[in-house]
Amino acid sequence: MTRTVKRDENAYARLGWLLVLFGFGGALLWAAFAPLDQGVAVPATVIISGQRKSVQHPLGGVVKHILVRDGQHVEAGEPLIRMEPTQARANVDSLLNRYANARLNQARLQAEYDGRRTLEMPAGLAEQAPLPTLGERLELQRQLLHSRQTALANELSALRANIEGLRAQLEGLRQTEGNQRLQQRLLNSQLSGARDLAEEGYMPRNQLLEQERQLAEVNARLSESSGRFGQIRQSIAEAQMRIAQREEEYRKEVNGQLAETQVNARTLWEELSSARYELRHAEIRAPVSGYVAGLKVFTDGGVIGPGELLMYIVPNSDSLEVEGQLAVNLVDRIHSGLPVEMLFTAFNQSKTPRVTGEVTMVSADRLLDEQNKQPYYALRAQVDAAAMGKLKGLQIRPGMAVQVFVRTGERSLLNYLFKPLFDRAHVALAEN
């Protein structure tokens, strides 16, 4: 019986040793051949995919209402801050009225210069300056056009009437001259016979002298008429010249006013465009959809300067990126395209899943941390689109901590354990 018990004990011992041997051998084989993920752990933080947008006001002014707060989500184009618009609106209204008057005045002067008697609304003015009194202003310009053209016409008509009067005088003078020349011929005929009679004694000497005196008077009147002809013709020429000069003066005057008005209208349009730009910016709107961050204005009625930074808008993004600092001695093992696993340590570890992604960028040169003065390479990784669904319901904000594990390959447990020893031994054997 004692032999039987001893034999059983030896059998159990051998079985135990076999189990230990097989277990150790299996563990050794697993450690030698089973693949384990090889990688690099990098602490990182969530960053904005794309840059945050600065919100500024180009002109500055007085804040009327602040419509948002830090952390508030806004849509693109949504009002953020409302500026006091009173001065800008008054400036627009004033310039609008002046511009409308300048354009209507320009149209009236152009009609005067062209000699047109009708005046139409300038093209595009109703859209550029939609004023309720635009029609009344156009009618006033029509009345001014008519009155100025009438005044000029009356002035020229008076000059033409003077010319007609001079021409009538000229015609009367021609008739008088004709009569005088007829009288001259008759007197010459009478004198030729009277001189013969007087020489023969048939006619008194004093009667001959009377006829000669009459002829001399007729000749004097003819000479006077000839001089009068020249004066009247000169007066007609001067009157015609005055008409031409007045018309030329009028055109020059209108042309000068027209050029001045055109310049004034262009200047006013530029000023109006600038004033409208200022009025449009009385409401500062979100450039993109996202979250308000870094709000720097807190008081209604406060004054902000031109170009002053008011807040940032952190854009919404369909992608999620993280950025970390990669140790300098590990940069040779990391490159773009490597798969990563990310763990958002700001959330409950038991409920937050690991999400997959890939390395999108490793900086080309090393950088220096301003706080600890340690060199590093910037590493960026992006969450896969398929993995974004795992983060639904979680509010991911820029700056949150993330643990990133970059998978660089596979190796065995024995390689993990003995490679540092082999590397050290290789260095030690190489030393002199």
From Swiss-Prot:
<dbReference type="InterPro" id="IPR050739">
    <property type="entry name" value="MFP"/>
</dbReference>
<comment type="function">
    <text>Involved in the secretion of alkaline protease.</text>
</comment>
<keyword id="KW-0997">Cell inner membrane</keyword>
<dbReference type="GO" id="GO:0055085">
    <property type="term" value="P:transmembrane transport"/>
</dbReference>
<dbReference type="InterPro" id="IPR010129">
    <property type="entry name" value="T1SS_HlyD"/>
</dbReference>
<feature type="transmembrane region" description="Helical">
    <location>
        <begin position="15"/>
        <end position="36"/>
    </location>
</feature>
<protein>
    <recommendedName>
        <fullName>Alkaline protease secretion protein AprE</fullName>
    </recommendedName>
</protein>
<keyword id="KW-0472">Membrane</keyword>
<feature type="topological domain" description="Periplasmic">
    <location>
        <begin position="37"/>
        <end position="432"/>
    </location>
</feature>
<dbReference type="GO" id="GO:0009306">
    <property type="term" value="P:protein secretion"/>
</dbReference>
<dbReference type="Pfam" id="PF13437">
    <property type="entry name" value="HlyD_3"/>
</dbReference>
<keyword id="KW-1133">Transmembrane helix</keyword>
<dbReference type="GO" id="GO:0005886">
    <property type="term" value="C:plasma membrane"/>
</dbReference>
<feature type="topological domain" description="Cytoplasmic">
    <location>
        <begin position="1"/>
        <end position="14"/>
    </location>
</feature>
<dbReference type="InterPro" id="IPR006144">
    <property type="entry name" value="Secretion_HlyD_CS"/>
</dbReference>
<dbReference type="GO" id="GO:0046903">
    <property type="term" value="P:secretion"/>
</dbReference>
<comment type="similarity">
    <text>Belongs to the membrane fusion protein (MFP) (TC 8.A.1) family.</text>
</comment>
<keyword id="KW-0812">Transmembrane</keyword>
<keyword id="KW-0813">Transport</keyword>
<keyword id="KW-1003">Cell membrane</keyword>
